[in-house]
Amino acid sequence: TTLLEMGIRDIAIIATEKTVDIYRKLLGEGSRFGAALTYLTQPEPGGVAQAFLIERHFIGEDHVCLLLGDNIFINTHLDLISSVAAATEGAYILAVRHGKPEQYGVVSFTRGGRILSLEEKPQKPRSRYIVPGLYFYDASVVGAAEKLPVSARGELEITDVNQRYWQDEKLHVFRLGRGTRWFDAGSPEDLFKAARYVRNRQKQTGKLIGCPEEAAYRKGWIGWRELEWSAGQNRHSLYGKYLIRLMEYA
């Protein structure tokens, strides 16, 4: 849904050999979301930056957005950021304040807002701004990833990719404001926090968070017929009932 809301419709999903068919069965080829989905496999864990090597042919000469599957963004106005990034040479990363920056990639700034440092999970962070799992790059990211050395953790680090763009003075950063909610749902505790927030927010607003059919419908990529089909497929669930209500007000 996050990608669709940014206007991105050509999407590659990278998963393990054991799970890729689960995603394919769940999401299909993407037409019911007004998108085209491609499925790629990661043979073994090799770091976030390995994604660019796996999808090098998918990227081709295009700009690319990389979104980590356990990152949840709410109220971020990412469509505006995506539009700017797509027209910009180099790379765009986000920055958000966090209480435990040592667990993430950390970015620090000068008083003028220029990037001062980029570090991967530092023991003594220079700032409380961390880099969440949503990145925008031009097509040269594939070449940058190909030249990366394997880190001490045995991985191709995304922070090293960003370092290369920064050294070439082609790295841009957008600090997310206080109205933004971001969750890293990579642990049971963090997943619980995210689920609790989403539940409360949905009860308050009456709107689902993470409904790709709704995002596609509001973009004009699918019509009433596709919405009706998805509602029928999920008619016995709360999700299906939500789509039916959406159709009634469409």
Where are these regions (language model features)?
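Catalytic-core segments of class I nucleotidyltransferases/pyrophosphorylases
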Residues: 65, 85, 114-214, 218, ...
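Conserved N-terminal catalytic core of the sugar/cofactor nucleotidyltransferase
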Residues: 1-68, 72-79, 187, 229, ...
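A short acidic, often aromatic-flanked loop/helix-cap motif at beta-alpha or helix-coil junctions
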Residues: 45-48, 100-102, 124, 181-182
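Short coil/turn connectors at secondary-structure junctions
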Residues: 8-10, 34-36, 60-64, 87-91, ...
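Residue-level signal for inorganic ion chemistry
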Residues: 55, 70, 107, 113, ...
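Short, amphipathic C-terminal "tail helix"
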Residues: 221-222, 227-250
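Hydrophobic packing residues within well-ordered alpha-helices of enzyme cores
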Residues: 23-27, 145, 194, 243
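Conserved donor-nucleotide/metal-binding helix-loop-beta segment in metal-dependent transferases, i.e.
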Residues: 75-103
